[in-house]
Amino acid sequence: MENFPTEYFLNTSVRLLEYIRYRDSNYTREERIENLHYAYNKAAHHFAQPRQQKMLKVDPKRLQASLQTIVGMVVYSWAKVSKECMADLSIHYTYTLVLDDSSDDPHPAMVNYFDDLQAGREQAHPWWALVNEHFPNVLRHFGPFCSLNLIRSTMDFFEGCWIEQYNFGGFPGSDDYPQFLRRMNGLGHCVGASLWPKDLFDERKNFLEITTAVAQMENWMVWVNDLMSFYKEFDDERDQISLVKNFVTCHEITLDEALEKLTQETLHSSKQMVAVFADKDPQVMDTIECFMHGYVTWHLCDARYRLHEIYEKVKDQDTEDAKKFCKFFEQAANVGAVAASEWAYPPVAQLASVRAKSDVKEAQKPFLSSIELVE
């Protein structure tokens, strides 16, 4: 990849991992595979349903890849929640990734959004119809305050994706625009609130810690994602409306200056995340730390982010940052590099095909009247 600032990326990544004291020990290998398969299996059966297949209209390979990516993110990061909660969150966040990759204009289906919502009618937009159907399965795990954050943040995410349809990076001089859009489509509040299921936390007792965690996670989670995504998005035509690129446009600065701005804010947020919760409820701190470490492991190990390419490029270099990065990468790979064949089975397309054949056979059964049944 030409012109990619490899040395700068290595230095930034190393500082981030050192600040959060990266040491992912969330699972044994057996536990990780068990949780991955449980969440994947439930989510795969959900998306194999005829209604989901018909309304989403997503290429089977893309849906499969999206599901595997999200299951990995949830299982690696939400290490403290139940397997059932992991599965329901995996379904919800897969819906968000499907929307993020969509290029359909939402305007026509959103004309009567509030009227339909108020009247209790099914939403005209197929994504909202499906997400609303699944939402009760997600919200049952959380108290009312966390649930409201999940609902509100999901609505913000939809609006953020709507804005991104225009491939608009902001007007020069509009300094607030990049962070506005990133907060809108980052799902930070949804992620921050979904770490506290009611079977583990009393949201009234831990209200102050939870509220602060939601506030801190909003930036930390999306900024880390932006840093870890910078390599894969660097020369991808589909990823030109990123926070870094929008900094360049709106702040009228160079790409290096924009990356440095993101770097400093991410590192500051990481320091805050560790410092603020260091003397708070140990269970809260443990949950946050497990999330941060698992979230980093997921980025380093998931093929979507292509960070293994950086590793292969620099593993023989003798610089301090290269050696530290490779050590962290190998540490992550030792716990998180699990082949999809070990847990992501059967494929969604196969499950959907079986369901479709079963429905055809059911439809072909002879109809018997009540009189014939009696006879």
From Swiss-Prot:
TS is a member of the terpene cyclase group of enzymes. It catalyzes the isomerization and cyclization of farnesyl pyro-phosphate to form trichodiene, the first cyclic intermediate in the biosynthetic pathway for trichothecenes. It serves to branch trichothecene biosynthesis from the isoprenoid pathway. Trichothecenes are sesquiterpenoid toxins that act by inhibiting protein biosynthesis. It catalyses: (2E,6E)-farnesyl diphosphate = trichodiene + diphosphate. Pfam families: TRI5. Belongs to the trichodiene synthase family. Transmembrane segments: none annotated. GO terms for molecular function: trichodiene synthase activity. Its EC number is 4.2.3.6. It comes from Fusarium cortaderiae. Gene3D superfamilies: Farnesyl Diphosphate Synthase. Signal peptide: none annotated. This is Trichodiene synthase. It comes from the Eukaryota. GO terms for biological process: sesquiterpenoid biosynthetic process. It is an enzyme of class 4 (lyase). Pathway: Sesquiterpene biosynthesis; trichothecene biosynthesis. Keywords: Lyase. InterPro entries: Isoprenoid_synthase_dom_sf, TRI5_ascomyc, Trichodiene_synth.
